[in-house]
UniProtKB/Swiss-Prot annotation:
It is found in: Cytoplasm. This is Elongation factor Ts. Belongs to the EF-Ts family. One of its GO terms (molecular function) is translation elongation factor activity. GO terms for cellular component: cytoplasm. It comes from Mesomycoplasma hyopneumoniae (strain J / ATCC 25934 / NCTC 10110). Associates with the EF-Tu.GDP complex and induces the exchange of GDP to GTP. It remains bound to the aminoacyl-tRNA.EF-Tu.GTP complex up to the GTP hydrolysis stage on the ribosome.
Amino acid sequence: MSQIDKMAKIKKLREISDAPFVDCKKALENSDYDIDLAINWLNKSGKSKALKKSDRIAAEGLVLAKKDPNSVLVFELNSETDFVAKNQNFINLQQKIGELLLANDFTNLEDALLIQDEAGRPISELLILATATIGEKITLRRVFKTKYSLEQSVEVYTHSNGQIAVITILKGGNLEIAKNISMHVAALNPQYILKIEVPNEKLQEIQLEVEKKAFAEVKNFEKKPENVKAGILKGMIDKQLSEFVLELQPLATDSAITVEKYLAQNSATLEKVVRFEVGEGIQKQNVDFSAEVNQQIQEFQKK
């Protein structure tokens, strides 16, 4: 290999890893000038700045739901800032990872990270490369994938801003029904899918609260027949539950009927609903910009 070719390789590795010139040169010399092997060498030796970003919090990013004739998938790809999430390199990476995840079988996130692209690079390495190239920590945080049959109606919905993605699997029904449910779940974010999923303790709390409210607000409630009381209480309880139970909620596209009735009218039953929203459950780091600038000034003055 000519000296010019070697310098070109060093330049390329520097652009990818953001590591110093000397370290890039050493990495390539120890890797027979193979870029991928050199990246691994830098990561193992801790010279790559991508590795030094690994302890940062990545709570922004994008989610995406995809399907093919056999499987359906939803996953979350994170960055440190929403600005980077709009970067075309980040968007391209998300699309590539989505294709790899959909085309390959895996049982958990750890297995998913081992899936290789056409060049033999695992997803974990693609994330390291993206971290070095983009300049922020990039992570594949979570993924859900399942197979489905012809008897099921499966549809996906990813909100236009890429912050919310939903998959819906129905027994019976059709794709339009599944799509409407996915859009409903994206908008209202119900905590539970079915009433029977609500914990008994929570149900008992609601029942006691509703009974007190009925005696206080419903005229002559205590004098009404037991069957009338039961009907009033059920209606009040269901109304409160509809704030967080999918099947009891008025359908987002037609508030005249509940999701439960909408499904029944179309001979469909809910089998699985999965909703991902970017950053949910992550404790975001609050950065004091002024303090950060002052710290950098102090460090500079010490030099």
